[in-house]
Amino acid sequence: MARIDFDDRTICNEYGSLYKKRNNELINSKEADINMIVGRRSNGKTYPTSTFDGVKRFIDSNYTDAFAYVRRYDSDLKAMQVDLFKGCIGNGWLSWYTKGKWNDIYYYRGKWYLRRLNDDHEVEEKMKNPVAYAFAINRCEAYKGPD
């Protein structure tokens, strides 16, 4: 993916995407505690909504407001572990938006975390709070939480 120089004139730079496929303005305007998006394939649910809005909200909340990434099957999660945030990492948006503080997102034990890699792809710093949690509906009985 080509790196993009983001600035105030870059189209859609707030969301890290040059695509104008934004189907979630109505959902975000509700300011609900839980937003659920259901729709047909390839209509802009995951990429702009989860990836950019979720990561952006996490960063803007001083790294406290994580989000849940829910799929129907755990096999769907396994396929997305590496690629889910590839768009905001590969084009340089994450580094730009955090002013160089973070430039990568990695998956570990059902959670995604921010981290900074150096030019040799060695880890310099890791975020302790996860940016997102992974859940599969078919595994819901295995999850633990408060009663």
Model regions and ranges:
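Conserved Walker A/P-loop ATP-binding site and its immediately adjacent core
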Residues: 63-87
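Flexible, charged surface loops at secondary-structure boundaries
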Residues: 28-31, 59-64, 125-128, 144-146
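Short hydrophobic/aromatic beta-strand immediately N-terminal to the Walker A/P-loop
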Residues: 33-38, 68
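Hydrophobic positions on the alpha1 helix immediately C-terminal to the Walker A/P-loop
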Residues: 48-52
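Pre-Walker A adenine-sensing motif
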Residues: 1-33
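Histidine-anchored nucleotide/phosphate-binding helix
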Residues: 53-59
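Inter-Walker segment of RecA-like/P-loop motor cores
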Residues: 84-145
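Walker A (P-loop) phosphate-binding loop of P-loop NTPases
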Residues: 41-46
